[in-house]
From Swiss-Prot:
Residues 1-22 form the signal peptide. A reversible disulfide bond can be formed between the two subunits in the homodimer; this has no effect on GDF2 activity. Residues 23-318 form a propeptide. GO terms for biological process: activin receptor signaling pathway; angiogenesis; BMP signaling pathway; branching involved in blood vessel morphogenesis; glucose metabolic process; intracellular iron ion homeostasis; negative regulation of cell growth; negative regulation of endothelial cell migration. PROSITE patterns: TGF_BETA_1, TGF_BETA_2. The gene is Gdf2. Residues 401-415 are annotated as: Interaction with ENG. One of its GO terms (molecular function) is cytokine activity. Disulfide bonds join C155-C236, C326-C392, C355-C425, C359-C427. Keywords: Angiogenesis, Cleavage on pair of basic residues, Cytokine, Disulfide bond, Glycoprotein, Growth factor, Secreted, Signal. This is Growth/differentiation factor 2. Pfam families: TGF_beta, TGFb_propeptide.
């Protein structure tokens, strides 16, 4: 199993340690992802096998957490100041409150217009014309499923809105071979047209243009759309989209995509393989140590090790209540407390849960003990000072939806971000 997958699988541990220490996450830029397998797991010292460096472990987990969100580091404050479109916040709220609402894609991004050149309508050309400039960037391992252009349409002159609106608009993809970015003569491709009946947000499907832009992956050319708007009603001779700088209703793109890297499935399979290997190794070591200790104990004390099981078990049952057994308990994670509130938009906090309590003999079915956990518990009863109890650990993790800003300040909604909350606890 790769060290990166291991650390991502243990993300809840990283969160829990940071919260319990009540310290902000600092020096992210100093964490280097280029560690070897030994150092990235927090094992330090060539001659000190098994020495665990917690600080190094946490620093490398920070790097992998950011990498799993396609972030190279903590987004700068300057790029995270702009407020995300209300649409993205509404989308997040819908997915988190309505469990039956499932998006077609697991990643949603919004890209605001960067610039616009506008031309007013004339008698010879009765259209409002706009060249909209965007900067669309999607990781290559993601597959775009849909792209929408959202425009706010309104009547720019004072009229009685009760009469409604009547007009149309057409959207073109401005090709890269145009001589200047604000000219589109003869270098545009028709994308979509739409009738206008009411004032408000209009959604136009423009997936083909965005897919072309991403395939081109050009850093020298801007992503350009031409939008023309025409009014068909005399009572509103200036029907137009909202483009003035500072407007709350500026045009923006919404791009839906799926992560094709399949990292969740790969991580789960590798984690399962690693756990199985570790359990087999620990079982062999535990049995070997138990036999050695048993021989020493019987020679020195002349006792049968199993005679202590009954009284020990009785005392253990009397001293432990139901609440001290392995179970899932609440653990609130507040992103402001750990220094992430500048780039994580929502949730502000969530319940990560944690596993607390002991694994006492006999192990109940609700803690889903493995064969190794059962054997380790039995050996612990016989040699409590030599062999530790089985551990109460997460056995199943659940996802949360997270709305955050990436390196470029792009609002990104990741639906079902895996491994962020404990779903079940057990003895391992």
């Amino acid at each position: 199993m790769s060290p990166g997958a291991f650390r991502v699988a243990l993300l809840p541990l990283f969160l829990l340690v940071c919260v319990t220490q009540q310290k902000p996450l600092q020096n992210w830029e100093q964490a280097s992802p280029g560690e070897n397998a030994h150092s990235s797991l927090g094992l330090s010292g060539a001659g000190e096998e098994g020495v665990f460096d917690l600080q190094m472990f946490l620093e490398n987990m920070k790097v992998d957490f950011l990498r799993s969100l396609n972030l190279s580091g903590i987004p700068s404050q300057d790029k995270t100041r702009a407020e995300p479109p209300q649409y993205m916040i509404d989308l997040y709220n819908r997915y988190t409150t309505d469990k039956s609402s499932t998006p077609a894609s697991n990643i949603v991004r919004s890209f605001s217009v960067e610039d616009a050149i506008s031309t007013a309508a004339t008698e010879d050309f009765p259209f409002q014309k706009h060249i909209l400039i965007f900067n669309i960037s999607i990781p290559r391992h993601e597959q775009i499923t849909r792209a929408e252009l959202r425009l706010y349409v309104s009547c720019q002159n004072d009229v009685d809105s009760t009469h409604g609106l009547e007009g149309s608009m057409v959207v073109y993809d401005v090709l890269e071979d145009s001589e200047t970015w604000d000219q589109a003569t003869g270098t545009k491709t028709f994308l979509v047209s739409q009738d206008i009946r009411d004032e408000g947000w209009e959604t136009l499907e423009v997936s083909s243009a965005v897919k072309r832009w991403v395939r081109a992956d050009s850093t020298t050319n801007k992503n350009k759309l031409e939008v023309t708007v025409q009014s068909h009603r005399e009572s509103c001779d200036t029907l137009d989209i909202s483009v003035p700088p500072g407007s709350k209703n500026l045009p923006f793109f919404v791009v839906f995509s799926n992560d094709r890297s399949n990292g969740t499935k790969e991580t789960r399979l590798e984690l399962k393989e690693m756990i199985g290997h570790e359990q087999e190794t620990m079982l062999v070591k535990t049995a070997k140590n138990a036999y050695q200790v048993a021989g020493e104990s019987q020679e020195e004390e002349g006792l049968d090790g199993y005679t202590a099981v009954g009284p020990l078990l009785a005392r253990r049952k009397r001293s432990t209540g139901a609440s001290s057994h392995c179970q899932k308990t609440s653990l609130r994670v507040n992103f402001e407390d750990i220094g992430w509130d500048s780039w994580i938009i929502a949730p502000k906090e969530y319940d990560a849960y944690e596993c607390k309590g002991g694994c006492f003999f006999p192990l109940a079915d609700d803690v889903t003990p493995t064969k190794h956990a059962i054997v380790q518990t039995l050996v612990h009863l016989k040699f409590p000072t030599k062999v530790g109890k089985a551990c109460c650990v997460p056995t199943k993790l659940s996802p949360i939806s997270i709305l955050y800003k990436d390196d470029m300040g792009v609002p990104t909604l990741k639906y079902h971000y895996e491994g962020m909350s404990v779903a079940e606890c057990g003895c391992r």
